[in-house]
Amino acid sequence: MNQDFVRGVNQAILIIHSCEQKRLEQTKRRGRRLSIVGLIQDEISLVYGLVIGGVDRKAYIKMMEQEAQQAAQIGRLRVIVQDNGPIHRCHEVKQLWSKWENQGLYIFFLPTYCSEMKPIELEWQHLKKDELAGQMFDDELDLAYAVIHGVEVRGERGNYRTQRVKFNSNPAT
C-alpha cells in the first residue's frame, strides 16, 4: 500500500477527531421562571398561555372560561381531564364548576401521581427537548419568544392548530 496514501488517511482521521465541542456559557444573570399552562386535544389543537412566575388561579380560570364559552357557542360538550393541582381545586374554581357544566364544560381529575396519563406533559417534554434544548436566552422575553416559536413549529409538524391565550399582566406599581 502506498505510504503517502496511508499518511493522508491518518491525517484525515486525525483532523476529523480534532473537532472542538461547542460550548455554551451560562450567563451570570438568573432570570425569572416562565410557566406555561395548556390544554391539548390530541392531533387537533393545543391552547396555551405563558406567565412570568407561576400560573395563578386567575390565568387558569380565564382559560377555562374561554373553553366553557366555546363549548356553549358550538353546543358540543367539552371534557377537561387534569391533575389534582391546587389551582384546579381551589375554592374560587370549585364555585365555577356548575356554571361551566351548564355551558357544556366538564372537568374530571386523574388519580394522583399519574403523569403518564397526561398527554400535555409529554408535549412539554418534547417542546423542551426538541425545540429549546441547547439554547441560551438573555432574558425571559427571548425564552418566551422561543417557546411560542417552538409550539408553532410543533403544531405545523404535527398538523394541529395552536392558539395562545394572552393573560393580562399586572403593571408594577
Protein language model annotation of sequence segments:
Residues 120-173:
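C-terminal anion-handling pockets and recognition modules
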Residues 1-2, 75-89, 118:
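Acidic/histidine-rich, metal-coordinating catalytic segments
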Residues 22-28, 100-119, 136:
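RNase H-like polynucleotidyl transferase catalytic core
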